[in-house]
């Protein structure tokens, strides 16, 4: 029996060698392998093979899987791009490969039982949930935007409309963690690292449950504060995120690198418009112990980027535009040359992480789509890297998932689709990839996704909107999510966190750098000409013209 390849793909998903377009980004992926055996496929539904006596094993759930996602195309920095089934047990990825009943099929990796729930993944794409390491939690509604974009892990600062830039108070952290029990996202908080004494930093870690520090110029990014934060971080194995001294009052970029003295740091919005040494903080992008990241307002570089950032800077930094000094400080941070070079550095793998900077000059729900819009822009400018865009797509998915997890010590739990990790998975229709997820699974449980008219006869009746699923209600959000804390909080055992979440210690944050990131390990001498603004990498000029329009935008959003 033969079947038309398009008809086969419509029923069973694409085969090895088939190609998929990712939204309107211009990116095309090729399926590298297929775990299915043609002619003996696993498929759920009326008259299909996922039945007792056929491809479902009559066994207790504890001997099979709780949930299986069948025949989905995985895009993952670790797994590559391939069609597999994903077995989930007790909230974690249990098996990856061919699904079915080993009593009736050969080569089964994912045992599906008569008690297993099935998510039909045929025709869909699965990615690991995105990890956003730069979120100003000024509003609880940020979580709606984050979940609706495919973010399942947040490293945050603040606990509402307060001037925080890090949270140190055990009292405040107690209530902030408690508030998150209503949301199916993993959460970690950064303590404020801008202190010349270590006492409030240690207090934040051991008593409050913070998972790292934020050193910010608005609160002090001088020599003593930066060194203090790094010393405490080295002792407790947590990450330090840096928003460096944009006024160069105490330190230039060269001075900051000397203070680091080879110690690992995560340099936020490394392009500089979001803050940092003027005009050349981008020099830190090529340094072996500096993990650089971008925030999404400058991604990809577009025609309106320069104009829109002035008002954003004034607002979030409480500047007064009638004061000449304040206006000049804002304008000095906006440089078209570094914005254009930022896209190119991402494409070369010299910047390994993207994040939102939500409500601190970024948009919580746009990191995923802006990252892939940037990838599409770079393909349009520099051309495809081969017969398909697999390498480029994997490089960019790593910026959203495994690399931020590695930087903040979360990669033993999240960031990739691997056996043993939390089953934080996002399912996408290919035509909506990067823009709007179809379903967000938190620890394998439906948490957010497309929902239809609740009074309709089927769940696909319009209007279709993104909204909370059962994993976002009742006691479930806390039970399927974790709180990332410092090991000191677990060792001391005296934190006052009321959360029912499992506490997980961050680890492996020190002594790492770009070389430890996935698919984004380029280092080199990045220089910014202070007169012309031209950016070079190892002497080669980096330029990118502002885009007139970007993908994953107006086609999907009003």
From Swiss-Prot:
Cofactor annotation:
Ni cation
N6-carboxylysine occurs at 214
Q: Which GO terms describe its molecular function?
A: nickel cation binding; urease activity
Q: Which positions are annotated as binding Ni(2+) 2? A: 214, 243, 269
Instruction: Give the E.C. number(s).
Output: 3.5.1.5
Q: How is the cofactor bound?
A: Binds 2 nickel ions per subunit.
The entry describes its oligomerization and partners as: May form a heterohexamer of 3 UreC (alpha) and 3 UreAB (gamma/beta) subunits. May also form a heterotrimer of UreA (gamma), UreB (beta) and UreC (alpha) subunits. Three heterotrimers associate to form the active enzyme.
Q: Tell me what this protein is called.
A: Urease subunit alpha 2
């Amino acid at each position: 029996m033969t079947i038309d390849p398009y008809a086969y793909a419509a029923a069973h998903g694409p085969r090895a060698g088939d190609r998929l377009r990712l939204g309107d980004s211009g990116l095309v992926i090729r399926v590298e392998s297929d775990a299915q055996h043609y002619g003996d496929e696993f498929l759920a539904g009326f008259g299909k093979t996922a039945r007792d006596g056929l491809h479902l094993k009559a066994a207790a759930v504890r001997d099979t899987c709780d949930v299986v996602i069948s025949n989905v195309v995985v895009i993952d920095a670790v797994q590559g791009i391939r069609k597999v089934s994903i077995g989930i047990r007790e909230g974690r990825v249990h098996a990856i490969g061919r699904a079915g009943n080993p009593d009736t099929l050969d080569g089964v990796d994912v045992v599906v039982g008569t008690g297993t729930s099935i998510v039909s993944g045929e025709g869909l794409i699965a990615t690991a949930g995105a990890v956003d390491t730069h979120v100003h939690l000024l509003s609880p509604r940020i979580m709606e935007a984050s979940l609706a974009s495919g973010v399942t892990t947040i490293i945050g600062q603040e606990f509402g409309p307060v001037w925080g830039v890090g949270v140190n108070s055990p009292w405040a952290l107690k209530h902030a963690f408690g508030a998150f029990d209503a949301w199916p996202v993993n959460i970690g908080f950064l303590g404020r690292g801008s202190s010349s004494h270590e006492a409030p930093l240690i207090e934040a870690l051991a008593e409050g449950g913070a998972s790292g520090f934020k050193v910010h110029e608005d609160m002090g990014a001088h020599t003593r504060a930066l060194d203090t934060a790094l010393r405490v971080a080295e002792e407790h194995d947590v990450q330090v995120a840096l928003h460096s001294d944009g006024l160069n009052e105490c330190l230039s970029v060269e001075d900051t690198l000397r203070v680091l003295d080879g110690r690992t740091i995560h340099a936020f919005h490394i392009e500089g418009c979001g803050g940092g040494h003027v005009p050349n903080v981008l020099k830190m992008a090529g340094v072996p112990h500096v993990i650089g990241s971008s925030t999404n307002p400058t991604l990809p570089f577009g025609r309106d980027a320069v104009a829109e950032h002035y008002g954003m800077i004034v607002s979030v930094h409480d500047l007064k535009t009638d004061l000449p000094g304040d206006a000049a400080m804002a304008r000095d941070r906006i440089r078209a040359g570094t914005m254009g070079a930022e896209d190119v550095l991402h494409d070369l793998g010299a910047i390994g992480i993207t994040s939102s900077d939500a409500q601190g000059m970024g948009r919580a729900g746009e990191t995923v789509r802006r990252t892939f819009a940037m990838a599409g822009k770079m393909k349009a400018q520099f051309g495809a890297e081969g017969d398909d865009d697999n390498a480029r797509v994997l490089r960019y998915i790593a910026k959203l998932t495994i690399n931020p997890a590695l930087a903040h010590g979360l990669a033993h739990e999240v960031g990739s689709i691997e056996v043993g990790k939390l089953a934080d998975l996002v399912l996408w229709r290919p035509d909506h990839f990067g823009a709007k997820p179809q379903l967000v699974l938190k620890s394998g449980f439906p948490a957010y996704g497309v929902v239809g008219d609740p009074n309709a006869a089927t769940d696909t009746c319009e209007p279709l909107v993104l909204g909370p699923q059962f994993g976002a209600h009742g006691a479930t959000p806390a039970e399927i999510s974790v709180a990332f804390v410092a090991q000191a909080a677990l060792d001391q055992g005296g934190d006052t966190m009321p959360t029912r979440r499992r506490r997980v210690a961050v680890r492996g944050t020190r002594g790492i750098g770009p070389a430890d990131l996935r698919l984004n390990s380029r280092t080199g001498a990045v220089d910014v000409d202070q007169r012309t603004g031209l950016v070079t990498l190892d002497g080669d000029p980096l330029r990118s013209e502002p885009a007139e329009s970007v993908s994953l935008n107006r086609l999907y959003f009003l």
